[in-house]
Amino acid sequence: MSSSATLEIRGVSRRFGKNTAVSDINISIPQGQMVGVIGRSGAGKSTLLRMINRLVDPSQGSIFFDGAEVSRLRGSPLRRWQRDCAMIFQQFNLVPRLDVLTNVLLGKLNHRSTLSNLLGMFSRAECAEAVAALERLDIARTALQPAGTLSGGQQQRVAIARALMQQPKVILADEPIASLDPLNAKVVMDSLQDINLREGITVVTNLHTLDTARTYCNRIIGMAAGKVVFDGPPEELNREAVRLVYGADSSGAEISEAITSTSVAFKPKIAASAGPLEPAFPGY
């Protein structure tokens, strides 16, 4: 990989039957950017990421990384690309019955020989690398627990540790915080940002929330109806841009930016009445 490997999406579309999920997308992402892709449900965000990783093939157009076309890869070259382009999912995609350490070690499968994978044995160095990844995500204490016993936030951090084991050049995160509470969402986004800043790994993450995208991403891409309707730095995501991305509700009113917030809000306590309690149903 060159020192300035670029992910390029050229005229990419994806159709499912008569429905067009993604339409004529053209994006160039230099190495080291942290990109937030925002938009309403059904805007085409997940389909875009799945095409980049080649979980879904484009109906037309091409995808390049570091000058090589990845949209035509098959067999071993495709597996190498999916190793280099790690995917993090909303629903974690862990093996619940396996312990956390083994789930993280599975990120090494595409680095190993077929025989080693069939034997199911990992080296001491690989185990040490997996533990280090868990320590970095502050969940090493869960290493021997079944992954299915962890909270959602912990499971997502395990998924990030597994992605790190792939030694990726690109990380794609498909709605990584959609099922998490605000505090766990912050931990997950802090982790992705740390990886981006420390390793210089390109991170592209789908997000529903504007405040999260503005806080963590140095570039925001807005999608609506399968098309890119905004592409720029967070400071350019103004009211008009938000309207283009999120549109209006069924009554025609503009979508309020407040409803896309993940901020933790605390409701003020209501002082209890000092007077005697009255029965709700007198006579009972």
Curated annotation (Swiss-Prot):
GO CC aspect terms: plasma membrane
InterPro entries reported for this sequence: AAA+_ATPase, ABC_transporter-like_ATP-bd, ABC_transporter-like_CS, ABC_transpr_PhnC, MetN_ABC_transporter-like, P-loop_NTPase
Pfam hit, one: ABC_tran
Catalytic activity reported: phosphonate(out) + ATP + H2O = phosphonate(in) + ADP + phosphate + H(+)
Localization in the cell: Cell inner membrane
Keywords: ATP-binding, Cell inner membrane, Cell membrane, Membrane, Nucleotide-binding, Phosphonate transport, Translocase, Transport
Subunit structure: The complex is composed of two ATP-binding proteins (PhnC), two transmembrane proteins (PhnE) and a solute-binding protein (PhnD).
Family recorded in the similarity comment: Belongs to the ABC transporter superfamily. Phosphonates importer (TC 3.A.1.9.1) family.
The protein's name in its UniProt record: Phosphonates import ATP-binding protein PhnC
Source organism of the structure: Mesorhizobium japonicum (strain LMG 29417 / CECT 9101 / MAFF 303099) (Mesorhizobium loti (strain MAFF 303099))
